[in-house]
Amino acid sequence: MDNIQQLKQWIDGSDRIVFFGGAGVSTESGIPDFRSVDGLYNQKYDYPPETILSHSFFMAHPEEYYKFHRDKLVVDGAKPNRAHLRLAELEREGKLQPVITQNIDGLHQAAGSKNVLELHGSIHRCYCMRCGRPYPAERVNHGTGVPHCDCGGIIRPDIVFYEECLDDDVVSKAVHYIREAEVLIVGGTSLAVYPAAGLLNYYRGSKLVLINRSATPYDDQANLIIHEKIGEVFAQV
């Protein structure tokens, strides 16, 4: 039995599956990832992307941040790929519990997934930093300059910048689901970003599946490793 057949067997036999995904899940939808050879961290800007995506940079240089945001984070026309669609289908079948994602693109919801835990927020939600008023993402993602609220405060995307903490409620839910999972499928992530990657340490089962095109720090703990494109894998299960 090859690895994809083994994964299919585990999926067919379980109704406590949890999926934990990163940027590689969306690259087949045309959204660049961060750490691959051709990802955002290897492209050249006036500042490194990890600097631009920090809280302190946003506060000091909101104009520069929004140039990057509109140029690189907003990908018009991106559609869910085979991985997003199959995961939504597994949820409808009562097999998949939540999708836990590090992505901010909203493609899991676009595919039909209802139970999505967004560790790093979403570019599809925005709010005023002064009064908290929510704003439609369209105003931020396709506007010009730095968007301001009627109260004068800066409108920011509801994403987690570097130097900021993850949402406690989202993290506690993710920990609960991972602890209770029978099958934990981890896909499209280098597992290099903490604290998100550390969530895998809460898994207590014996069916940890890693789907990634390159090695990860957790390979020695995995029960099944598949080095293929994640969309191609999910098209077969």
Question: Locations of the language-model features?
Answer:
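Conserved catalytic core of sirtuin-type NAD+-dependent deacylases
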Residues: 1-237
